[in-house]
């Protein structure tokens, strides 16, 4: 652990990701498993790689990620947010390009709670006129 590492916490829905960025060759390890093994869906893998591809540093860093909570989509979004924060800690000049792509902003959308008297959060029971 002599080499420097950069850290970023990412959140999305109910998922939280801790991302450690170290100089390396582009290996991404999520919960002690390779990225391709952890995420079965290609879209999730693509979401995770987006910030690195934007700043053209895919082969420059090794990433060690721990992620907990939520599902596949939320975890992928949380990892992307964490990578973005770690990249900004590494080099603050990357912030404008990452902000323009929309990776810096925490996606605040959460599942809306179910209300009493309704079937779901907003779905009402069928209305009968007579």
From Swiss-Prot:
Keyword field contains Ribosomal protein: yes
Superkingdom classification of source: Bacteria
PROSITE patterns membership: RIBOSOMAL_S9
InterPro entries (alphabetical): Ribosomal_Su5_D2-typ_SF, Ribosomal_uS9, Ribosomal_uS9_bac/plastid, Ribosomal_uS9_CS, Ribsml_uS5_D2-typ_fold_subgr
Gene Ontology CC terms, in alphabetical order: cytosolic small ribosomal subunit
Keywords: Ribonucleoprotein, Ribosomal protein
GO function term, MF aspect, one: RNA binding
Protein's UniProt keywords contain Protein biosynthesis: no
A single GO BP: translation
Pfam families noted in UniProt: Ribosomal_S9
Family: Belongs to the universal ribosomal protein uS9 family.
UniProt protein name: Small ribosomal subunit protein uS9
